[in-house]
Regions:
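Exported/periplasmic ABC-transporter solute-binding proteins
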Residues: 2-3, 7-187
Length: 187
Protein backbone atom coordinates (compact mmCIF):
# COMPACT_ATOMS: atom_id res chain seq x y z
CA UNK A 1 0.00 0.00 0.00
CA UNK A 2 0.92 3.60 -0.15
CA UNK A 3 1.55 5.81 2.84
CA UNK A 4 0.42 9.37 3.04
CA UNK A 5 1.98 11.80 5.44
CA UNK A 6 0.01 14.86 6.37
CA UNK A 7 2.08 17.59 7.94
CA UNK A 8 0.70 20.65 9.61
CA UNK A 9 2.56 23.32 7.65
CA UNK A 10 2.08 25.82 10.47
CA UNK A 11 4.71 23.90 12.46
CA UNK A 12 8.38 24.32 11.67
CA UNK A 13 10.65 21.33 11.34
CA UNK A 14 12.84 21.00 14.42
CA UNK A 15 16.44 20.45 13.37
CA UNK A 16 18.40 18.46 15.93
CA UNK A 17 22.19 18.26 15.70
CA UNK A 18 25.03 16.83 17.72
CA UNK A 19 27.47 19.11 19.50
CA UNK A 20 30.41 20.73 17.74
CA UNK A 21 33.34 18.31 17.89
CA UNK A 22 31.14 15.21 17.68
CA UNK A 23 32.44 12.66 15.19
CA UNK A 24 28.86 11.88 14.18
CA UNK A 25 28.24 15.57 13.45
CA UNK A 26 31.51 15.85 11.56
CA UNK A 27 30.59 12.89 9.36
CA UNK A 28 27.06 14.21 8.77
CA UNK A 29 28.31 17.68 7.83
CA UNK A 30 30.88 16.19 5.47
CA UNK A 31 28.55 13.63 3.86
CA UNK A 32 25.81 16.19 3.21
CA UNK A 33 28.09 19.07 2.25
CA UNK A 34 26.99 21.27 5.14
CA UNK A 35 30.31 23.03 5.20
CA UNK A 36 31.86 25.88 3.31
CA UNK A 37 35.42 26.90 2.81
CA UNK A 38 36.20 30.21 4.47
CA UNK A 39 39.76 31.55 4.25
CA UNK A 40 41.02 28.07 3.38
CA UNK A 41 39.29 26.45 6.37
CA UNK A 42 36.27 24.13 6.24
CA UNK A 43 33.50 25.70 8.31
CA UNK A 44 30.50 23.75 9.65
CA UNK A 45 27.39 25.58 8.43
CA UNK A 46 24.87 23.77 10.65
CA UNK A 47 22.07 26.22 11.37
CA UNK A 48 22.35 28.13 14.63
CA UNK A 49 18.64 27.37 15.12
CA UNK A 50 19.33 23.64 15.58
CA UNK A 51 18.70 22.04 18.95
CA UNK A 52 22.05 20.64 20.01
CA UNK A 53 22.33 17.30 21.81
CA UNK A 54 25.45 15.95 23.46
CA UNK A 55 25.10 12.23 22.76
CA UNK A 56 23.30 9.62 20.70
CA UNK A 57 20.76 8.70 23.37
CA UNK A 58 19.67 12.32 23.80
CA UNK A 59 19.43 12.68 20.00
CA UNK A 60 17.08 9.68 19.80
CA UNK A 61 14.96 10.86 22.73
CA UNK A 62 14.71 14.41 21.35
CA UNK A 63 13.69 13.30 17.86
CA UNK A 64 11.28 10.66 19.18
CA UNK A 65 9.59 13.24 21.38
CA UNK A 66 8.89 15.77 18.62
CA UNK A 67 6.90 14.66 15.57
CA UNK A 68 8.42 17.57 13.60
CA UNK A 69 12.04 16.81 14.52
CA UNK A 70 14.76 15.50 12.26
CA UNK A 71 18.21 14.40 13.40
CA UNK A 72 20.88 11.81 12.70
CA UNK A 73 22.43 8.76 14.38
CA UNK A 74 24.55 5.81 13.34
CA UNK A 75 22.75 2.75 11.96
CA UNK A 76 23.81 0.66 14.95
CA UNK A 77 22.18 3.19 17.29
CA UNK A 78 18.89 3.28 15.41
CA UNK A 79 15.92 1.96 17.37
CA UNK A 80 12.16 1.67 16.97
CA UNK A 81 11.55 5.07 18.60
CA UNK A 82 12.47 6.86 15.36
CA UNK A 83 12.24 6.21 11.63
CA UNK A 84 15.24 6.23 9.31
CA UNK A 85 14.76 8.22 6.14
CA UNK A 86 15.37 6.77 2.71
CA UNK A 87 18.21 8.42 0.80
CA UNK A 88 17.71 8.45 -2.98
CA UNK A 89 15.04 5.76 -2.50
CA UNK A 90 17.33 3.41 -0.54
CA UNK A 91 16.48 2.31 3.00
CA UNK A 92 19.07 2.44 5.77
CA UNK A 93 20.00 -1.24 5.95
CA UNK A 94 23.26 -3.12 6.32
CA UNK A 95 22.79 -4.63 2.85
CA UNK A 96 22.19 -1.24 1.21
CA UNK A 97 25.19 0.30 2.94
CA UNK A 98 27.40 -2.61 1.88
CA UNK A 99 26.20 -2.53 -1.75
CA UNK A 100 26.54 1.26 -1.91
CA UNK A 101 22.90 2.10 -2.64
CA UNK A 102 22.53 3.85 0.75
CA UNK A 103 25.23 6.44 0.34
CA UNK A 104 25.26 7.92 3.85
CA UNK A 105 27.72 5.91 5.92
CA UNK A 106 31.01 6.27 7.69
CA UNK A 107 33.51 3.85 9.16
CA UNK A 108 34.32 3.66 12.83
CA UNK A 109 38.04 3.75 13.48
CA UNK A 110 40.13 2.48 16.36
CA UNK A 111 42.85 4.94 17.30
CA UNK A 112 45.69 4.60 19.76
CA UNK A 113 48.21 7.13 20.97
CA UNK A 114 51.25 7.24 18.72
CA UNK A 115 54.16 5.42 20.29
CA UNK A 116 51.97 3.73 22.87
CA UNK A 117 52.84 0.10 23.46
CA UNK A 118 50.10 -1.27 25.70
CA UNK A 119 49.89 -5.04 25.36
CA UNK A 120 46.30 -5.18 26.66
CA UNK A 121 45.16 -2.45 24.25
CA UNK A 122 46.85 -4.22 21.33
CA UNK A 123 45.32 -7.56 22.31
CA UNK A 124 41.89 -5.95 22.73
CA UNK A 125 42.15 -4.54 19.20
CA UNK A 126 43.08 -8.03 17.98
CA UNK A 127 39.91 -9.28 19.70
CA UNK A 128 37.72 -6.55 18.19
CA UNK A 129 38.97 -7.37 14.70
CA UNK A 130 38.58 -11.14 15.20
CA UNK A 131 35.66 -13.28 14.05
CA UNK A 132 34.33 -13.27 17.62
CA UNK A 133 34.63 -9.51 17.98
CA UNK A 134 33.05 -8.80 14.60
CA UNK A 135 30.13 -11.09 15.48
CA UNK A 136 29.43 -8.79 18.44
CA UNK A 137 29.68 -5.80 16.09
CA UNK A 138 27.15 -7.39 13.70
CA UNK A 139 24.84 -8.57 16.50
CA UNK A 140 24.58 -4.96 17.67
CA UNK A 141 23.47 -3.53 14.34
CA UNK A 142 26.82 -2.33 13.04
CA UNK A 143 28.47 -3.54 9.86
CA UNK A 144 31.36 -5.93 10.54
CA UNK A 145 34.61 -5.98 8.61
CA UNK A 146 35.07 -8.84 6.18
CA UNK A 147 37.82 -11.44 6.19
CA UNK A 148 38.26 -12.02 9.90
CA UNK A 149 39.98 -14.85 11.69
CA UNK A 150 39.46 -16.44 15.09
CA UNK A 151 40.87 -14.60 18.09
CA UNK A 152 44.34 -15.89 18.88
CA UNK A 153 45.55 -13.18 21.21
CA UNK A 154 48.21 -13.31 23.88
CA UNK A 155 45.85 -12.52 26.80
CA UNK A 156 48.27 -10.21 28.64
CA UNK A 157 47.78 -8.82 32.15
CA UNK A 158 47.12 -5.15 32.75
CA UNK A 159 44.67 -2.47 31.77
CA UNK A 160 43.76 -0.17 28.93
CA UNK A 161 41.59 2.93 28.79
CA UNK A 162 38.83 2.97 26.17
CA UNK A 163 37.00 6.15 25.20
CA UNK A 164 35.25 7.59 22.21
CA UNK A 165 32.02 8.40 20.47
CA UNK A 166 28.67 7.80 22.15
CA UNK A 167 27.67 6.26 18.80
CA UNK A 168 29.99 3.36 19.51
CA UNK A 169 29.68 3.12 23.31
CA UNK A 170 26.97 0.42 23.45
CA UNK A 171 28.82 -2.00 21.17
CA UNK A 172 32.19 -1.11 22.72
CA UNK A 173 30.86 -1.98 26.19
CA UNK A 174 29.78 -5.39 24.88
CA UNK A 175 33.18 -5.90 23.24
CA UNK A 176 34.93 -5.03 26.52
CA UNK A 177 32.72 -7.44 28.47
CA UNK A 178 33.35 -10.25 25.97
CA UNK A 179 37.09 -9.52 25.87
CA UNK A 180 37.32 -9.70 29.67
CA UNK A 181 35.68 -13.14 29.52
CA UNK A 182 38.34 -14.44 27.10
CA UNK A 183 41.14 -12.56 28.85
CA UNK A 184 40.47 -12.49 32.60
CA UNK A 185 43.95 -10.93 33.03
CA UNK A 186 42.67 -7.64 31.57
CA UNK A 187 41.25 -4.94 33.79
Amino acid sequence: GSEMCIRDSSNDITIVSREDGSGTRGAFVELFGIQQEVDGEKVDMTTVDAQVTNNTSVMLTTVAGDEYAIGYVSLGSLDESVKALKIDGAEATEENIENGSYKVSRPFNIAVKEGADNEVANDFITYIMSTEGQKIVADNGYIPVADTKAYDGTKPSGSAVVGGSSSVSPVMEKLIEAYKSVNPNAK
